[in-house]
UniProtKB/Swiss-Prot annotation:
Compartmental location: Basolateral cell membrane; Basal cell membrane
Alphabetical UniProt keywords: Cell membrane, Glycoprotein, Membrane, Transmembrane, Transmembrane helix
GO cellular component, one term: basal plasma membrane
Native source organism of the sequence: Macaca fascicularis
Extracellular compartment spans: 31-135, 188-190, 246-248, 359-368, 417-425, 478-484
Comment text on domains: Multiple cysteine residues are necessary for proper targeting to the plasma membrane.
Source taxon at top rank: Eukaryota
InterPro entries linked to this entry: MFS_dom (IPR020846), MFS_sugar_transport-like (IPR005828), MFS_trans_sf (IPR036259), Orgcat_transp/SVOP (IPR004749)
Protein name, UniProt field: Solute carrier family 22 member 6
Membrane topology per record: Multi-pass membrane protein
PTM summary: Glycosylated. Glycosylation is necessary for proper targeting of the transporter to the plasma membrane.
Length: 550
């Protein structure tokens, strides 16, 4: 009897699965908020230099006398006159406004608080020479996500999914709350890094715990549900950020609910599959019988015994012996080729994705509106992506998604700043293509790697995505050279990566490889068993989507 048969015996998709899946998925609403909350908590309002403390504005001719103008006729953000400049304003940077000696803002800045009453930028003056620190905060958060994926992924295999989830909920609640009360910028960054670590663990173990309690034929549906819940979280963030504009209050609001998640997570039932893989048949039996009672299948649960479990576990133990290490990806030429090509695709997708979603202020429209639009475009993008990869194939879908995304971003770099409608439309289209690229790369990676190293390959791909999300905020610092430089870089990387897809084989309609030998000889028709395996198992890999990237 296979493990899937055991799940069917204790109720399949019963009351227990419905309750636990709902409770495990619920925190993902706020996970999306944590990933991109810095668009609001680190927003940069309009600002200009504060006059000297001893300045007499009424005598000097008002604040305008201290502010030089830029080429657009707006007050300079990072310079002031060393002495007041009398006379009419000179919006074109001529005469007094163009010849007066200037100096940095040694007395601080005055911010326009009409949209954002308080952000980490205004509180700690992360502008001008300190502007790079704003992006550093987001990069450190992504470093935490990278570390969390490695640390908590390992701990979940050692300690169990439930225990690690409980720890992650508590860590997110505590670190997120502490970040809201951080007295200075370094401490804020430290707590954000810890939040990134724990949220990566939540994303990883949420998916694992849910699918390990679901029958095969429902796992793709659960994965799709998880993806759409994450997208819904992007809508939620826009509304919450609009209602709560103060950065400390917003940070607190998206963190405190994790205390509730921590409390109810104690009632989760540990994965019986994990118990069995750890050799704890007694705990496996106890968990299955408990689920049977909740699902109203008490009599079926009573029929289970240690002997039945041993028979079911035998195949899993045999498959477990065939697992390969990550080093196998580099030792074997065929796997090394896949690893290098797929790493480029993972990196490019995540790099460009976070380059777009973490620069909402750069499109010249309401930051709240574009947050909603960016969340909404995921819905049709995921649907269109699903249809394309199942009709035209994985390789052309992956190539088209990256190529179109890159072209849209590159075009955005040459569109004038005042054309906000065109720039926003291109950004939304590019973001939708990158969402489709995330869908495709999860699926494509799962189909390319053989069973013996499939999970390891997916894990390494996810790691490269984390690297892309870490580097992406740092690239935005190149705006100091020229405003469109980041967009040219964000666009060029996916365009270049799209060419890599021609080096990969097509997997549409092909049986899943179990060994490297299968990979090297992808020929022959699929057996009915292989067709079922591909139909239900592969979409599971795709369902993680960009939330793990995130």
């Amino acid at each position: 009897m296979a493990f899937n048969d055991l799940l069917q015996q204790v109720g399949g998709v019963g009351r227990f699965q419905q309750i636990q899946v709902t409770l495990v998925v619920l925190p993902l609403l706020l996970m999306a908020s944590h990933n991109t909350v810095q668009n609001f908590t680190a927003a940069i309002p309009t600002h200009h230099c504060r006059p000297p403390a001893n300045a007499n504005l009424s005598k000097d001719g008002g604040l305008e006398a201290w502010l030089p103008r830029d080429r657009q006729g707006q007050p300079e953000s990072c310079l002031r006159f060393t002495s007041p400049q009398w006379g009419p304003p000179f919006p074109n940077g001529t005469e007094a406004n163009g010849t007066g000696a200037t100096e940095p803002c040694t007395d601080g800045w005055i911010y326009d608080n009409s949209t954002f009453p308080s952000t980490i930028v205004t509180e700690w003056d992360l502008v001008c020479s300190h502007r790079a620190l704003r992006q550093l905060a987001q990069s450190l958060y992504m470093v935490g996500v990278l570390l969390g994926a490695m640390v908590f992924g390992y701990l979940a295999d050692r300690l169990g999914r439930r225990k690690v989830l409980i720890l992650n909920y508590l860590q997110t609640a505590v670190s997120g709350t502490c970040a809201a009360f951080a007295p200075n910028f370094p401490i804020y960054c430290a707590f954000r890094l810890l939040s990134g670590m724990s949220l990566a663990g939540i994303a990883l173990n949420c998916m694992t715990l849910n699918v390990e309690w679901m029958p095969i034929h429902t796992r793709a549906c659960v994965g799709t549900l998880i993806g759409y819940v994450y997208s819904l979280g992007q809508f939620l963030l826009a509304g919450v950020a609009y209602a709560v504009p103060h950065w400390r209050h917003l940070q607190l609001l998206i963190s405190v609910p994790f205390f509730a998640f921590f409390i109810y997570s104690w009632f989760f039932i540990e994965s019986a599959r994990w118990h069995s893989s750890s050799g704890r048949l007694d705990l496996t039996l106890r968990a299955l019988q408990r689920v049977a009672r909740i699902n109203g299948k008490r009599e079926e649960g009573a029929k289970l015994s240690m002997e039945v479990l041993r028979a079911s576990l035998q195949k899993e133990l045999t498959m477990g012996k065939g697992q390969a290490s990550a080093m196998e990806l580099l030792r074997c030429p065929t796997l090394r080729h896949l690893f290098l090509c797929l790493s480029m695709l993972w990196f490019a997708t995540s790099f460009a994705y976070y380059g777009l979603v973490m620069d909402l202020q750069g499109f010249g429209v309401s930051i709240y509106l574009i947050q909603v639009i960016f969340g909404a475009v995921d819905l049709p993008a995921k649907l269109v992506g699903f249809l394309v990869i199942n009709s035209l194939g994985r390789r052309p879908a992956q190539m088209a998604a990256l190529l179109l995304a890159g072209i849209c971003i590159l075009l955005n770099g040459v569109v004038p700043q005042d054309q906000s409608v065109i720039r926003t439309s291109l950004a939304v289209l590019g973001k939708g293509c990158l969402a489709a690229s995330f869908n495709c790369i999860f699926l494509y990676t799962g189909e390319l790697y053989p069973t013996m190293i499939r999970q390891t390959g997916l894990g390494m791909g996810s790691t490269m995505a984390r690297v892309g999300s870490i580097v992406s905020p740092l690239v935005s610092m190149t705006t100091e050279l020229y405003p469109s430089v980041p967009l040219f870089i964000y666009g060029a990387v996916p365009v270049a990566a799209s060419a890599v897809t021609v080096l990969l084989p097509e997997t549409l309609g092909q049986p899943l490889p179990d060994t490297v030998q299968d990979l090297e000889s992808r020929k022959g028709k699929q057996t009915p068993q292989q067709q079922e395996h591909q139909k239900y198992m592969v979409p599971l890999q795709a369902s993680a989507q960009e939330k793990n990237g995130l």
